[in-house]
Amino acid sequence: MSTDVNRRAVLLGLLSAAAMWDESPIGAQDAQTAPDPTLYIPRAHVVEERAFLHDFMEEYAFVSLITTTPALRITHIPTILDRARGRLGTIRGHISAQNPQKAALDGTHPAVIVFRGPHSYISPSWYAVRESVVPTWNFGVVHASGRPRLITDRDKAYDLLATLIRTNERRAGSTSYDFAAQPREYVDRMMQGISPFEMEIDALEGKFKLGQERSEGDRSGVLEHLKAGGYKERSLYDLTAALYQNRPK
């Protein structure tokens, strides 16, 4: 986000009480058909509400695409989310046409896309009780699993780029760049250098380790120090404060 105020407004919007603390699973159908979990999540740190996870994925859309066929490959890319396609949504993005990872993007091989949110070291000196305590690291993360496939239709590939650019131009506060006004011949040449793909999501896992299980005094101390920190710490403060605010009493 362009400012701390805007970023916190987004996070507060994400963490509505109804969305954050829905203890029901995504759905019985999802539980029966989802792949094995990729992430260890203690119950206190689980978030299962789909709208919240989607909001988080859109806010932190620069991801790690992880595949293991024919070898372990990890690529870091921006993405866009289509919430309406598939049971849990569809993620779209592109990698370099020269990237050997594209061999895994044929719709048959499993992949995990990792969305990382704010994170920070947490010092025991911030707690109200400072005996028998150790440091930790607080964070929010979402894993999306599926079987990505290359987009071979040129019009669909163009639409992916147009949507990705339009979304990020809006987030950057820019109004002067018009991708549609670029010469199509030039765009077609540039598109030869990318391998666009889409992945219908088979499973979503949300882990938000933000000290939910600690005492009120400990949580207050953590918030105080995060708020006084740098940009990274203040980003985590925004997410943590919103979570604490909407936590059931």
What would you call each of these model-derived segments?
Residues 52, 66-69, 100-103, 130-133, ...:
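Catalytic micro-motifs at enzyme active sites that drive phosphoryl/nucleotidyl and oxygen chemistry
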Residues 20-25:
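C-terminal segment of classical bacterial N-terminal signal peptides
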Residues 2-17:
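N-terminal secretory signal peptides and thylakoid transit peptides that target proteins
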Residues 61, 75, 87-91, 107-111, ...:
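A generic structural signal for short beta-strands and their flanking turns/coil linkers
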Residues 80-123:
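A short mixed-secondary-structure module that forms the rim of ligand-binding clefts
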Residues 36-41, 118-249:
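Charged, gly/pro-rich active-site loop segments
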Residues 33-88:
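An N-terminal domain-cap segment
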